[in-house]
Amino acid sequence: MAANATMATSGSARKRLLKEEDMTKVEFETSEEVDVTPTFDTMGLREDLLRGIYAYGFEKPSAIQQRAIKQIIKGRDVIAQSQSGTGKTATFSVSVLQCLDIQVRETQALILAPTRELAVQIQKGLLALGDYMNVQCHACIGGTNVGEDIRKLDYGQHVVAGTPGRVFDMIRRRSLRTRAIKMLVLDEADEMLNKGFKEQIYDVYRYLPPATQVVLISATLPHEILEMTNKFMTDPIRILVKRDELTLEGIKQFFVAVEREEWKFDTLCDLYDTLTITQAVIFCNTKRKVDWLTEKMREANFTVSSMHGDMPQKERESIMKEFRSGASRVLISTDVWARGLDVPQVSLIINYDLPNNRELYIHRIGRSGRYGRKGVAINFVKNDDIRILRDIEQYYSTQIDEMPMNVADLI
């Protein structure tokens, strides 16, 4: 097991990495030498899966995808220390889809996640990437009808993504048969342990065939996780992904000086035609501000959708579905959107409010240029926000220039 490497980087190293255009030069740590595969075409993936990857909007694999997908496909047990925003979900999703025998209508891969939302998101991602493969994939989560789970599992599912409690329940009821499972993925393993799922994870593992390949993704590697990897894994390869250096790459960042809060709205209206060139997300710091801005934009006859954490899950899902499909083009949101949700078409982010802490900045704008896409981020900055903007610049060793008149040409 490789020693737990430090996540910190010096200011000068951070600066060097941020300016680095070539993702293969991102500082990476692995427990052994790992080949870098710079394109999806050179990974040896099946043709119908490649079609799904490109149709989904991915163009170039992210740094973790360039390193981990080949290792997982080869059958290696893999520990990926990585946070959301690095492309981790697509890393294991592509690998899982590559390893399936579609002719066999039995569960061949099991993915455990800490929350229902994440499990559903993983399931939807698998169905989208596997669109040309005729893949069956079910989300097995608490809070839903048990009978429906049993019916779906009886029908036959190639992949099951779910929360540990419900998955174990389905295994115990013999509705989820484990004999054909080849791969177990533990996503956000540290979060699962924080939520008290340790027992259920071990219970699930005991029912899997002895030769099951294990892929574990975790932002941190505390003692309990390392204990789990020792029990579940054989000679795992460990890949550490440092996120902050990756995600400002290829993103042009600008600010617009607004003297007072009231002027932000007029500035946004002036920019609306630019927003709808592709798709845009507008971030506000509070739910109340999201509701207020949405109403004000609609009163001015602009088409926008909005989302925040107080909305019922069903409503959030349908808003995300509309946005993903391109039916809605401008989404106003709080930071609930900024973590782990992939919409490849988003190429413009507007910070109507600068984030309350500088770590959130990368969560927000890092998504606008992911997977080799370029992006633009525009920050609305009041006079008393200048200090915060400078702090963000310094923290990320980046440069945020005044927005040029021709910003539409850059998107």
Swiss-Prot record:
Keywords: Acetylation, ATP-binding, Cytoplasm, Helicase, Hydrolase, Isopeptide bond, mRNA processing, mRNA splicing, mRNA transport, Nonsense-mediated mRNA decay, Nucleotide-binding, Nucleus, Phosphoprotein, RNA-binding, rRNA processing, Spliceosome, Translation regulation, Transport, Ubl conjugation. A motif (Q motif) lies at residues 38-66. Residues 250-411 form the Helicase C-terminal domain. The modification N-acetylmethionine is found at residue 1. Its EC number is 3.6.4.13. Belongs to the DEAD box helicase family. eIF4A subfamily. GO terms for biological process: embryonic cranial skeleton morphogenesis; mRNA export from nucleus; mRNA splicing, via spliceosome; nuclear-transcribed mRNA catabolic process, nonsense-mediated decay; positive regulation of mRNA splicing, via spliceosome; positive regulation of transcription by RNA polymerase II; regulation of alternative mRNA splicing, via spliceosome; regulation of nuclear-transcribed mRNA catabolic process, nonsense-mediated decay. ATP-dependent RNA helicase. Involved in pre-mRNA splicing as component of the spliceosome. Core component of the splicing-dependent multiprotein exon junction complex (EJC) deposited at splice junctions on mRNAs. The EJC is a dynamic structure consisting of core proteins and several peripheral nuclear and cytoplasmic associated factors that join the complex only transiently either during EJC assembly or during subsequent mRNA metabolism. Disulfide bonds: none annotated. A motif (DEAD box) lies at residues 187-190. Identified in the spliceosome C complex. Core component of the mRNA splicing-dependent exon junction complex (EJC); the core complex contains CASC3, EIF4A3, MAGOH or MAGOHB, and RBM8A. Interacts with CASC3, MAGOH, NXF1, RBM8A and ALYREF/THOC4. Component of the ALYREF/THOC4-EJC-RNA complex; in the complex interacts with MAGOH, RBM8A and THOC4 (via the WXHD motif); these interactions are likely specific to RNA-bound EJC. May interact with NOM1. Interacts with POLDIP3. Interacts with CWC22 and PRPF19 in an RNA-independent manner. ATP binds at residues 60, 65, 85-90, 342, 367-371. The modification N6-acetyllysine is found at residues 124, 198, 296, 321. This is Eukaryotic initiation factor 4A-III. There is a cross-link at residues 19, 152, 314, 374, 382 (Glycyl lysine isopeptide (Lys-Gly) (interchain with G-Cter in SUMO2)). The modification Phosphoserine is found at residues 10, 12. One of its GO terms (cellular component) is nucleus. The modification N-acetylalanine is found at residue 2. It holds the Pfam family DEAD. It comes from the Eukaryota. It catalyses: ATP + H2O = ADP + phosphate + H(+). One of its GO terms (molecular function) is RNA binding. The ATPase activity is increased some 4-fold in the presence of RNA. The modification Phosphothreonine is found at residue 163.
